[in-house]
Curated annotation (Swiss-Prot):
NCBIfam families linked to this entry: L6_bact
Organism encoding this protein: Aeromonas hydrophila subsp. hydrophila (strain ATCC 7966 / DSM 30187 / BCRC 13018 / CCUG 14551 / JCM 1027 / KCTC 2358 / NCIMB 9240 / NCTC 8049)
Protein name (database record): Large ribosomal subunit protein uL6
A Gene Ontology term for the protein's cellular component: cytosolic large ribosomal subunit
Protein's job: This protein binds to the 23S rRNA, and is important in its secondary structure. It is located near the subunit interface in the base of the L7/L12 stalk, and near the tRNA binding site of the peptidyltransferase center.
Signal peptide bounds: none
Length: 177
């Protein structure tokens, strides 16, 4: 059994977990999430603890048990604390603003870029060069951040573009004459 799957997931107070076959739904203060668990993983709920174990005779069940445990743990964290991803816009004239349910970006193109936000993700712009994305689904928040970053990824010479707040951009040296 994988080391990750051996550690149980503790359910904090105020979080409601419902296990219906291989369908797991978690409700908390920030929202609710539903996930189907792989058929090779057996989930048991005892008191305020979820335990994961691989089923015998199914190939890859050990790895799936660890993956399921990590995903469910992220669901519990999401409905209690939520997830946040910060983006920075670096470059002259690069700006961001919120227009309804979309992020409007000026990234040096001949046209403004509008990125529609999916349900479950909210955005705010504390400054014109910062975007803060929040939501309960870690994967969805990260995917939206990656999609916005992909419009203008940091270039390697000056570092201009959209980057994650904690990202270190490796810059190259300019060509010598």
């Amino acid at each position: 059994m994988s080391r990750v799957a051996k550690a149980p997931v503790t359910i904090p107070a105020g979080v409601e977990v419902t296990l219906n076959g291989q369908e797991l739904s978690i409700k908390g203060g920030k929202g609710s999430l539903v996930r189907s668990i792989h058929a090779g993983v057996e989930v048991t709920k005892e008191d305020n603890v979820l335990k994961f174990a691989p089923r015998d005779g199914i190939a890859g069940a050990d790895a799936q048990a660890g993956t399921a445990r990590a995903l469910v743990n992220n669901m519990v964290i999401g409905v209690t604390q939520g997830f946040e991803r910060k983006l920075q816009l670096v470059g002259v004239g690069y700006k961001a603003s919120i227009k309804g349910n979309a992020v409007a970006l000026a990234l040096g193109f001949s046209h403004p870029v509008e990125h529609a936000l999916p349900a479950g993700v909210t955005a705010e712009c504390p400054t014109a060069t910062e975007i803060v994305l929040r939501g309960v689904d870690k994967q969805l928040v990260g995917q939206v951040a990656a999609d916005i970053r992909a419009y203008r990824a940091p270039e390697p010479y000056k570092g201009k573009g959209v980057r994650y707040a904690n990202e270190q951009v490796r810059t190259k040296e300019a060509k010598k004459k």
